[in-house]
């Protein structure tokens, strides 16, 4: 762990974002597991690696770390668990490109929630970014209405739970800056696994699918979230926001190359507008986040 911490923060965030970008092709590669079974096993393995990380980091204070995080930590974990569930649902029912581009709207929801709950003003740059971002979203949803099934369109709608849940988590962190939110990731993993268990019907899946769930939980989101958490500690928020766009760029490209999922030009256009709005806000907006 000390060796990892010696790596520059931006590099850790970038590697973490690259890990997250594999989520789409992993979910699409399951053979027989339904989405709730995928959710259960993915979060089960995620909870294991977070537990190992917490044991290495906190040692004898492992259980105390949960107590210290208190209600804010639980609320943060609950919010993140809904995001985890929405991610699997969206990737299972709609395209990787749509899901990844919708995830990038987190900044829009973050600015909006910050205005209402943190009393942080929305400046002109942020307002322009929000308008641009929502324009991109409307293009993606409009495209979905014309060329996708009702199930795929529902996947796009559910996908919005992800950026909203992540924005809620950040707002909780901002409201309680002294509370360690790392234990909240374990809480999120367990709660999401419970959601999957309830709706899965049965949890037995093939060895092939179990291996994919292991890759998703242990490496894709496990290493991804841990590296981003460590890297964010020494990386300016604006740079983190830009580096996190790696997931939205690599995700659709990986789906294109490995599973031949080619996004329509309208989706690419809408996604490009969303990414531009985030870059615009990151470089020219107030560094509230």
Label every model-predicted segment.
Residues 50, 54, 80, 112-113, ...:
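Hydrophobic transmembrane alpha-helices of multi-pass small-molecule transport proteins
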Residues 11, 99-105, 173-191, 221-257:
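Helix-helix packing/entry segments at the starts of transmembrane helices
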Residues 21, 77, 81, 85, ...:
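Hydrophobic/small/kink-forming positions within alpha-helical transmembrane segments
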Residues 1-39, 78, 86, 148-175:
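Glycine-/small-residue-enriched transmembrane alpha-helix faces in small-molecule transporters
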Residues 37-39, 43-48, 88-119, 238-256:
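Specific alpha-helical transmembrane segments that line the substrate/conduction pathway
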Residues 1-18, 46-75, 121-127, 145-154, ...:
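Membrane-interface interhelical linkers
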């Amino acid at each position: 762990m000390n060796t990892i911490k010696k790596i520059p923060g931006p590099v850790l965030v970038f590697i973490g974002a690259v890990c997250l970008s594999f989520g789409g092709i992993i979910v699409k590669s399951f053979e027989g597991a339904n989405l709730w079974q995928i959710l259960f096993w993915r979060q089960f393995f995620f909870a294991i690696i977070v537990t190992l990380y917490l044991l290495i980091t906190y040692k004898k204070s492992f259980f105390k770390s949960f107590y210290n995080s208190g209600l804010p930590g639980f609320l943060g974990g609950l919010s993140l668990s809904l995001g985890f569930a929405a991610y699997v649902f969206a990737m299972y029912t709609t395209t990787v490109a749509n899901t990844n581009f919708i995830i990038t709207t987190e900044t829009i929801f973050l600015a909006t929630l910050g205005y209402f709950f943190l009393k942080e003003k929305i400046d002109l740059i942020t307002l322009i970014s929000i308008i641009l971002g929502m324009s991109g979203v409307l293009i993606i949803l409009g495209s979905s209405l014309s060329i996708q099934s009702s199930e795929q369109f529902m996947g796009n709608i559910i996908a919005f739970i992800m950026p909203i849940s992540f924005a809620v988590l950040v707002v909780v962190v901002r409201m309680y800056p002294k509370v360690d939110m790392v234990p909240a990731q374990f809480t999120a993993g367990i709660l999401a696994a419970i959601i999957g268990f309830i709706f899965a019907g049965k949890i037995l899946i093939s060895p092939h699918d179990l291996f994919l769930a292991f890759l998703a939980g242990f490496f894709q989101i496990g290493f991804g979230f841990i590296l981003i958490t460590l890297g964010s500690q020494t990386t300016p928020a604006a740079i983190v926001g830009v580096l996190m766009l790696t997931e939205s760029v690599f995700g659709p490209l990986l789906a294109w190359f490995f599973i031949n999922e080619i996004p329509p030009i309208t989706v690419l256009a809408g996604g490009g507008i969303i990414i531009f709005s985030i870059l615009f806000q990151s470089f020219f907006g107030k560094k509230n986040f």
